[in-house]
């Protein structure tokens, strides 16, 4: 059997989805708060450099360009250090998410099979009723004729 998920009317069910993009974004910011600080420092340095350039202050402009480089270095350091520090936790989280995905896929498959069984049962009941009605119609026709 292939690993592709089976189609079902349960696809849009909210209990099959675990973490939204916003939840992931906030979780990642909480895990590594230094990266957004580095982004903010770099952006602030660029904004101050722009203001200095407009004012014609070349000394402040050069200071802000250096500050931008320091902000980039800080951000890069935060990314690398966070990657090293949280590497094991990320691997464990990926394993957990994989196991969770397998469980959800199995639940979807089970729900899909249950739905198919219900539909099959309804179809059999309908066929039996239709056959009974057809038999009754034939008997009624025999009695007339």
From Swiss-Prot:
It is found in: Mitochondrion membrane. Residues 86-144 form a coiled coil. Belongs to the RCF1 family. PROSITE patterns: HIG1. Residues 6-97 form the HIG1 domain. The lineage of its organism: Eukaryota, Fungi, Dikarya, Ascomycota, Pezizomycotina. The keyword Mitochondrion applies. InterPro entries: Hypoxia_induced_domain, RCF1. GO terms for biological process: mitochondrial respirasome assembly. Its main location: mitochondrion. Pfam families: HIG_1_N. GO terms for cellular component: mitochondrial membrane. Keywords: Coiled coil, Membrane, Mitochondrion, Transmembrane, Transmembrane helix. Cytochrome c oxidase subunit which plays a role in assembly of respiratory supercomplexes. Associates with the respiratory chain complex III/complex IV supercomplex. The chain crosses the membrane at residues 33-50, 69-86. It is a multi-pass membrane protein. It comes from the Eukaryota. It comes from Ajellomyces capsulatus (strain NAm1 / WU24). This is Respiratory supercomplex factor 1, mitochondrial.
